[in-house]
Amino acid sequence: MINLILLGLPGAGKGTASESIVDKYHLAHISTGDMFREAMANETPVGLEAKSYIDKGDLVPDEVTAKLVEERLKQPDTKNGFILDGFPRTTVQAELLEGITKRLEKPLTNVIAIDVDEDVLIKRLSARYICKNCGATYNKISNPTKVEGTCDRCGGHEFFQREDDKPEVVKNRLEVNKKMNTPLRDFYEEKGILSTVNGEQTPEKVFEDIDKILSKD
């Protein structure tokens, strides 16, 4: 059984890697965002508790998020293993998760950090641009328009960049994430379950390296 967390800064490629891992190993992909939406829509007790904070614009306390994660990990689709997306974000959450996995007898088997140099991440994240006419999203590095300056979808010629994709904003976002990511890495390194892969390779090669780590266990 594989019970896994992927770590990495925004733009490191965690989403793409998660999809490949789920496809090959048939793991339950557990995203905290999806969990919140589902629990609130189904009006479960924990979902309603989370909603009371979200409706006021407050952050959902760690204990409530942890309850939601525990509820989700009890579902039958996690019997082959799971990959956690968006939790834990802090060492406090990591400790709460440790309690949950012990209670459910579903210990974490792997924590894999996808490492990408900060300058590369800034280039990746600030390369996004959007068609003014139809909203189609492109990336100068990984997904440019087929004809330069012309939208593939509507043929429009005007594009814009979102404020939060501008290099100085991206840099600040990475700094904030790094402050949370580093203690988490240290936490799992001490537990002896942290592995790292080079995220500056092609998505296929990144998955190949992750696959080697997961196949060892």
Curated annotation (Swiss-Prot):
InterPro entries reported in the protein's UniProt record: Adenyl_kin_sub, Adenylat/UMP-CMP_kin, Adenylat_kinase_CS, Adenylate_kinase_lid-dom, P-loop_NTPase
**Pfam families linked:** ADK (PF00406), ADK_lid (PF05191)
The alphabetical list of record keywords is: ATP-binding, Cytoplasm, Kinase, Metal-binding, Nucleotide biosynthesis, Nucleotide-binding, Transferase, Zinc
Q: Name one GO biological process term.
A: AMP salvage
Pathway field of the UniProt record reads: Purine metabolism; AMP biosynthesis via salvage pathway; AMP from ADP: step 1/1
Q: Which HAMAP family match?
A: Adenylate_kinase_Adk
**Name of the molecule in the record:** Adenylate kinase
Organism in which the protein naturally occurs: Lactobacillus gasseri (strain ATCC 33323 / DSM 20243 / BCRC 14619 / CIP 102991 / JCM 1131 / KCTC 3163 / NCIMB 11718 / NCTC 13722 / AM63)
Gene expressing this chain: adk
